[in-house]
Amino acid sequence: MAQGRSPLLQLPVEGYTKTEKDEIRLTFQIEAKDANGVLLQAPATGKVEANLSPEDKDWLPKLRATVLIPPLIPPGEYQLLVKVADELAKASVDAHSTFHVQGREIEPSRTLIVRNFRFLRTEDDTKPLPVAAYRPGDAVWARFDMTGYKLGDGNQFDIEYGLVVLRSDGTQAYAEPQAATQKEQTFYPVRYQPGVLSLNLAKDQKRGEYTIVLKVRDNLGSQTYEAREKFSVE
């Protein structure tokens, strides 16, 4: 499975009890957890009630539920626990399974840090530029990941970032103190946040080396982090 997907589960059930009128009554709960037992979402619950006819002799009830795979969870093995109760027989059964999640893995940190800063040619590029060189009139794109921020009650996070662009002599060419704010409360703890920035170079932009000073602030953890990355205009 991939990060951010919501697969629909359809699980057949056997061995249930029927009444004299061929009625069945099942309830179920489905939990998805990480390797540490942390729930990915609130447990999915439901019930199956049906009146069977002679034509349904080969029919099996199915448990249907959607499992949300959060978009920024680490790749790896995850657990699925299904609990089914037969209300007529006053019996229950548990079933366990595992599933693998694919996606990007960001090295964790105990303190605020920026990882994987990469310059791009366009907004949608997935491969970083081997040499961060642009021409006057180009758009400078960059992406990065922020991790190590503190989580508050209910897995809330509150981070923001701004930037300054310095010329080769250290003077300021551009500044955007608050380029973006990322504040959210999630069911599953989100340990990193992707960031993006862009600059539009003037057609008469002076050639030379420039430095982006990226300043990240963790408002809940009272932390700051500064990253410096160079690019050139040729």
Regions from the language model: what does each represent?
Residues M1-E234:
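Intrinsically disordered, low-complexity terminal regions enriched in Ser/Thr/Pro/Gly
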